[in-house]
Amino acid sequence: MSDDLSKRSLRELVSQPYKYGFHTDIENEEFPKGLDEDIIKEISKLKCEPSYMLDFRLKSYILWKKMSLPEWACLTYLNINYQDIVYYSAPKNSTKLDSLEDVDKKILETFDKLGIPLNEQKKLANVAVDAIFDSVSVGTTFKQELSNVGVLFCPLSEATNKYSTLVEKYLGSVVPIGDNYFAALNSAVFSEGSFCYIPPNVKCPLELSTYFRINNENSGQFERTLIIADFNSYVSYLEGCTAPMYDKNQLHAAVVELIALENAEIRYSTVQNWYSGDTNGKGGIYNFVTKRGLCAGKSSKISWTQVETGSAITWKYPSCILVGEDSVGEFYSVALTNNYQQADTGTKMIHVGRGSKSRIISKGISAGYSKNTYRGQVKININALGSINNSQCDSMLIGPYSQANTYPYIQVSNAMSRVEHEASTSKIEEEQLFYFLQRGISVEQAISLLISGFCRDVFVKLPMEFAVEADKLLSVKLEGTVG
């Protein structure tokens, strides 16, 4: 196969249009740009929050002002002007919605177009959705059906009043307000997110899902998710996100906290498809996210599964703190970068409890001029006797200009535990593609098959609703690549 065909195919494959880049023309209610204590107080007032929430926010803001940006990541980006961001933006009258019937027709059409129907006739079977548009939740499906079995699933702003005992107890318990620069910012200004509580001995009958949509060009999105799985319970949670195509960068700084009590299990799956910028690296979302789970009880389990294909910048490390005896933490990830995208992502597995186990499978795919970094920490404490970790980090390079980096940090403080780590780097070779062509399979189909096989260990961990979507998404993102 000629070099010209190879390079042309690669360019075509990594330059597929972003089909979610449309803007919804709708009237907004928004705060002026900038951040100070008055803005924070206004957010709290608008949400009718109890006093403990305002205290939480103001303490976070004071801490944030004293903190510095983390500079250790393999990322290069323009300085963010935090006074040039709108910290609250919502469709007009959205704070007065009593049901989905009251939601603006344009917003319902937007979510229909995104494949997330909210109205009663079209809503997804077996998936309860909380739809968040800029700074507010515009609707939650199947709330009554979930309530019938004791599952609480609602916007976080609603939970701060309705279920204040749970929120006050667990909010900030896994990700403290001063954990890092972006977590502190989120703790000060978050305006929406999802809350979920699974009562003892209940297996949630539906998949729970939150879909995040940024629409306003001047706003950032700062959602917060809090999930608590009580004794012997189970929940599977899905997360998706998209944004319009704008020439300037927008900030997304989220926090996710998971708490699994004794014998409880939480599966948290993400398909991240924020706008990644154009082929020259202009525009796109700056995605700075803190996700952490606490396996608090004996035999508890938390699994993170993610497919990262969007964002101009991704800084994200879903992690587990394994406190419970025989607790389990898992991290399965596919991170795809192309054009000028940069991703610095990975996980932490902190073993505290005896007999705790963790597994890490990370697949990084780099194309175009992009940079893809895996950063992982495995720490086994002195009292975590009999703990086991297995890590597998594989990178694939497509084209001559992309980069892949792996930074494992391993610390074992007792002689009764075991850590296994393996890593590989590969690239799609012309010889492989030649064999496919000899069998009548096009270059695009060949690359899609090779990528699917490379990512299979992660895709099989996704719920069925996401697995098919993720496979298609990678094919679209890399449709036409190489040679």
Swiss-Prot record:
SUPFAM superfamilies (alphabetical): Stabilizer of iron transporter SufD
Key words, A-Z: Chloroplast, Plastid
Any Gene Ontology biological process: iron-sulfur cluster assembly
Subcellular compartments: Plastid, Chloroplast
Pfam family for this entry, one: SUFBD_core
Record GO cellular component, one term: chloroplast
NCBIfam families to which the protein is assigned, alphabetical: PRK11814.1, sufB
Family, similarity comment: Belongs to the iron-sulfur cluster assembly SufBD family.
The protein's name in its UniProt record: Iron-sulfur cluster assembly SufBD family protein ycf24
